[in-house]
UniProtKB/Swiss-Prot annotation:
Keyword Transferase: no
Catalytic activity: beta-D-glucosaminyl-(1->4)-N-acetyl-D-glucosamine + H2O = D-glucosamine + N-acetyl-D-glucosamine
Sites where the protein binds substrate: Y53, G102, E103, D178, E179, E306, E347, Y379
Recorded consequence of changing E306Q: Retains 40% of wild-type activity
UniProt protein name: Exo-beta-D-glucosaminidase
Residue runs in coiled coils: none
Species of origin: Thermococcus kodakarensis (strain ATCC BAA-918 / JCM 12380 / KOD1) (Pyrococcus kodakaraensis (strain KOD1))
Role played: Exo-type enzyme that specifically cleaves the non-reducing terminal glycosidic bond of chitooligosaccharides. Catalyzes the hydrolysis of GlcN-GlcNAc to glucosamine (GlcN) and N-acetylglucosamine (GlcNAc). Involved in chitin degradation. Can also hydrolyze reduced chitobiose (GlcN2OH) and chitooligosaccharides of various chain lengths.
Length: 786
């Protein structure tokens, strides 16, 4: 029988590394007589894996009546679908819930269960929530709910087990629930959950407090004279102390963790293939709580992620989304590397949009592998329709611009997926190459919750979507400044890990834990380079005065409250050496101490400090992404990198060419992207090698990405470099793709002559390195080694 393992970034199936190229086909929404055609279209697109949900309420429409063979409806034939996928050579990822989301009635939870046991429903602070909302939230840890889930698993698990890859079937992974996030209510602090099992004396809230704090801790933290845990009620408004609100948030994360553990242990008794989960909490920085819980309880779970940018509107993935995707992949890389599991984007948006521009689709899909995610599943790859009575968001339709439509037609981004999937599953060493940024951004997890809530009780704005994560945020500025970055959790990361970076950027609000402030002090003292903005923390995690970082740096940032209302914020001009009137938004604070490096008029608003073996840049304003003729914001980032001695391994002559270097053992691929879409041309220097030599530049006619090989070797032959993507190297034939230019330059070592198919040689030079320029009318051409 087969074996499913993993190594590095890839799955290992029967001893062979496999890069997952998958697509979601929800068999219960597609006519059964069309399954084979749709699967064949997936294979045509270069896919090797099919992903599907198994909806509880579809297969158990009435309590105790199960159908997995299509006896009551042909689209309930789970067994037939699995056998067909196996016959056609697909791997299968299966997601049996109990909750599947999927824009499906109740997210898969049966109506009969809710009707019979309304006590399982989550409650608001004032009682029950409306019953007719599209996903009625359920109290995860309610014993009645868990008992019902157990009965569902008793029915569906034997079917899944029979078709596991380890039993000769196609299933290589089984997932836990779907995006466990308290039915997406985790984003709102007081929407849920006030179910009696949580709020009653001795309930789950009280239990969690006892496990995490002494009463003395809570007296200090919540500013109350408590004699017993039962006196500490669940918060219901922002009038409560902020530390208590953050604890309420963390308590709900803990309930999710406990629920996931219950499901995992149930699955682990049945399945010997990887058990997976998608985006726990639907948060990012909070993932630390999940990964820590996994380590503490020895849960061997593969954590997947997802990327959505245009939900029910036309596609919108241009350069101003790069910051968010760098950030999300960064924190994801941080955790999955430590967990040792392969990164996989299980829901990479390929549908649920009015239209999807193929160049924007390419930008999203092609940026994921260089950012550490070679395994990509496209959701929803095949469109369908909802059986009557099971619809949720979409009425009858479940074809919202999928690559393969309900009628089997192919939409424009089908070809984009095909090209990338074929490259990622065949290019020599590409999937294993690693991004190794010299810069990191440090994230402090409590800020994430305040941003979600729109919390307004601090001096600094908590609108991190505007100033950090969003289209105009700092992270997009860094990405568009050719500054690849990792993302690290400041509460979890070790000092040695921080010191492995040449520069650390930190966005600070009024408070930061004592431990993190002290860690940043030690980081600078031991030689680290810190950039911190737009203030320095003055309080600790309990909102008690604490300012070890400020005291160590000897820098004072003046106190002035930031504005929240977008109609009331200021537009101000900050200048620096070589920077004349750079636009910044919202309050600009004066900075005293250190060497002034930025000014608002005559007032210093930025300072450079050398301390211990390191340095710090302290800014009293927010840096954001703006594009203009003067390009001041990118120039300011480059200035700060130069000030602190940060040098990338690559340089570009055109700053709109965005580069992500992926390095393997003795070789590299440079992902070179045109994110804006207008034609650009330029040269790249990588570790001292400037390319191209014969052409006058690398041309990128439109939005898109090339994966340029450097030093890729087989035997005595080496691709020294190429200005086209190396798709495949089979025997003596190298297949290249360049869809962004009609001319490509290839440099080979260990070769005297070549034959070109799909193009013609129009220039060349020989010697130790054979260089040729190929003019090719199509995207693909082949170079045969003679």
């Amino acid at each position: 029988m087969g074996k499913v393992e993993f190594s590095g970034k890839r799955y290992v199936i029967d001893g062979e590394p496999v890069t997952i190229a998958g697509g979601t086909l929800q068999f219960f929404r597609v006519p059964a007589d069309a399954w084979k055609d749709r699967l064949l279209k997936m294979r045509e697109a270069g896919l090797n894996t099919v992903d599907t949900y198994v909806a509880w309420n579809w297969h158990e429409p009435e309590k105790g009546s199960f159908d997995f063979k299509g006896e009551t409806h042909p689209q309930r034939n789970l067994v037939g679908f699995l056998e067909l996928a196996d016959e056609l050579g697909f791997y299968v990822i299966i997601r049996p819930g109990p909750y599947i989301c999927g824009e499906w009635r109740n997210g898969g939870i049966p109506d009969w269960l809710i009707d019979e046991h309304p006590e399982i429903l989550a409650k608001g602070p004032n009682g029950p929530l409306p019953r007719d909302i599209y996903y009625p939230p359920i109290t995860y840890l309610h014993p009645t709910y868990l008992e019902a889930v157990g009965e569902w698993y008793n029915a569906v698990f034997p079917v899944i087990r029979k078709y596991l890859y380890t039993n000769g079937g196609p299933i290589i992974s089984v997932s836990i629930d779907d995006e466990p996030s308290y039915w997406e209510t985790i984003f709102q602090p007081f929407l849920t959950d006030y179910n009696e099992i949580i709020t009653k004396p001795g309930g789950l809230w009280e239990k969690w407090l006892e496990q995490n704090y002494t009463l003395e801790d809570l007296r200090r933290r919540y500013k109350g004279d408590f004699k017993d845990y039962s006196e500490i009620k669940v918060p219901t408004s922002f009038s409560e102390p902020l530390p208590k609100l953050i604890d309420w948030h963390h308590f709900k994360l803990w309930m999710i963790n406990e629920y996931v553990r219950w499901i995992y242990e149930r699955m682990a008794r049945e399945f010997d293939v990887p058990i997976s989960i998608l985006d726990p909490y639907l948060l990012q920085v909070a993932w630390r709580h999940f990964f820590t819980y996994m380590r503490e309880h020895n849960l061997k779970i593969h954590v997947w992620t997802e990327f959505w940018y245009s939900f029910y509107r036309s596609s919108d993935f241009k350069e101003d989304k790069l910051g968010h995707i760098y950030y999300k992949t960064g924190i994801y890389r941080y955790h999955v590397r430590k967990a040792g599991t392969p990164p996989l984007s299980i829901e990479t948006q390929s549908s649920l949009a009015h239209t999807i521009d193929p160049t924007e689709a390419e930008l999203l899909y092609s940026i994921l592998p260089p950012l550490g995610i070679p395994n990509i599943n496209y959701y929803l790859f095949v469109g369908g329709e909802n059986p009557e009575g099971y619809e949720s968001h979409n009425g009858i339709t479940w074809d919202v611009y999928s690559p393969v439509g309900l009628d089997g037609s192919e939409r424009p981004h089908f070809g984009v997926i095909k090209a990338l999937s074929e490259t990622m599953t065949s290019a020599e060493g590409l999937a294993d190459a690693e991004l190794r940024p010299k810069v990191a951004v440090g994230l402090y997890e409590p800020y994430e919750a305040l941003n979600l809530w729109g919390y307004e009780g601090l001096e600094e704005s908590t609108d991190l979507n505007e100033y950090l994560l969003g289209e105009r945020g700092l992270f997009t500025l860094l990405a568009m400044s050719n500054t690849p970055f990792d993302a690290v959790d400041l509460e979890d990361v070790t000092l040695d890990e921080l010191l492995s970076y040449d520069q650390l950027w930190v966005y600070s609000l009024d408070f930061m834990s004592r431990e993190v402030q002290d860690k940043l002090v030690e980081f600078v003292a031991r030689g680290g380079n810190l950039v911190i903005l737009p203030m320095l923390p003055r309080y600790d995690e309990n909102l008690e005065p604490y300012s070890s970082l400020k005291d160590f740096l000897g820098v004072e940032v003046e106190r002035e409250k930031a504005r929240r209302n977008p109609r009331l914020i200021q537009f101000l001009s900050v200048s620096a050496e070589g920077i004349d009137r750079m636009l910044v938004r919202n309050t600009v604070r004066g900075v005293r101490g250190g060497e002034p490096i930025a000014f608002l008029g005559e007032k210093p608003v930025g300072a450079f400090v050398r301390k211990g073996g390191g340095s710090a840049v302290v800014l009293g304003f927010r840096l954001q992404y703006y594009t203009s003729h003067h390009d001041l914001h990118r120039k300011f980032v480059w200035k700060l990198k130069e000030l602190q001695g940060v040098r990338e391994d690559f340089e570009v002559t055109n700053p709109d060419m965005i580069v992500l270097p992926m390095e393997g053992k003795g070789y590299a691929y440079l992902a070179v992207t045109n994110p804006r879409g207008h034609p650009i041309k330029g040269r790249i220097s990588y570790r001292g090698l400037e390319v191209p030599v014969l052409l006058d530049g690398i041309e990128l006619k439109r939005r898109g990405t090339l994966y340029l090989p450097f030093g890729v070797r087989k035997g005595d032959v080496e691709v020294a470099y190429a200005t086209a993507t190396l798709v495949m190297w089979e025997g003596d034939v190298l297949t290249f793709r360049n869809h962004l230019s009609g001319h490509s330059e290839i440099a080979l070592k260990g070769v005297e002559s070549v034959k070109v198919s799909g193009g013609k040689i129009v220039d060349g030079s020989d010697g130790e390195v054979l260089r040729i320029v190929i003019e090719h009318p199509g995207e693909y051409f082949e170079v045969e080694l003679l």
